Amino acid sequence: MKLLLLLCLGLTLASSHKEAGQDVVTSNFDASKIAGEWYSILLASDAKENIEENGSMRVFVEHIRVLDNSSLAFKFQRKVNGECTDFYAVCDKVGDGVYTVAYYGENKFRLLEVNYSDYVILHLVNVNGDKTFQLMEFYGRKPDVEPKLKDKFVEICQQYGIIKENIIDLTKIDRCFQLRGSGGVQESSAE
C-alpha cells in the first residue's frame, strides 16, 4: 500500500512539473493570449545609448492588442523632454512570433519566450541606414517579477551577446505609470 501511495505521489509531482513547464511557449504562439496589459520590466541592448535616458528605444509598454490581420498594436509611453507621452506602434506579422515595424529605422522582432499569464521576452534587431543593433525586452503582467525571472533574462541576453552591464532594470525608474489608462501628456519629475 505504501508503495502504491509513493508511486501515486511521484506521478502527481511529475505531472505537475510537466504542466508548469508547458506554461512557457517558444513557438506556435497564440497572439490572442498575448493581448492585454503589460509592464516593461527589463531592457537590454548591445548599443546601450539607445535604451538610456532620452534614448530612442527607452519605451514603456502599457497594452498589446491583436488586430484582425494578426498584427500587434502596442501602446507605449516614453519621456520627451521630461514629459511622459503616449505613442502607438502597429507591428505587422511576418511569421510565427515574428513582426516588423518602422520606428527609428526598420525593426524585426521575435517573441523568444512567453508565459501568457506572467511574461514575454522579445528580441529585436534594428537597422537604420548602415547601423544595426539588438534590443531585448522583458514584459510582465505585473509591475515587477521574481528575481529568478530577471536572472533568466540576463542569461538569454548573454546568449545574444548583450553584456549584463547593458541591461537596465526599469522597475527602479519612473515608467510613466501616471499615464496608464489615459491618453495624453503629463509632467514627470522622477527618473
Swiss-Prot record:
The keyword Transit peptide does not apply. InterPro entries: Calycin, Lipocalin, Lipocalin_CS, Lipocln_cytosolic_FA-bd_dom, Maj_urinary. The keyword Glycoprotein applies. In the submaxillary salivary glands of mature male pigs, but absent from that of females. Expression was much lower in submaxillary glands of castrated male pigs than in sexually mature individuals. Residues 1-16 form the signal peptide. One of its GO terms (cellular component) is extracellular space. Keywords: Disulfide bond, Glycoprotein, Secreted, Signal, Transport. Its main location: secreted. It is found in: Secreted. Pfam families: Lipocalin (PF00061). Glycans are attached at residue 69. One of its GO terms (molecular function) is odorant binding. Disulfide bonds join 84-176. Homodimer. Belongs to the calycin superfamily. Lipocalin family. Binds pheromones, the pheromones are released from the saliva of males and affect the sexual behavior of females. PANTHER family: LIPOCALIN (PTHR11430), MAJOR URINARY PROTEIN 1-RELATED (PTHR11430:SF76). This is Salivary lipocalin.
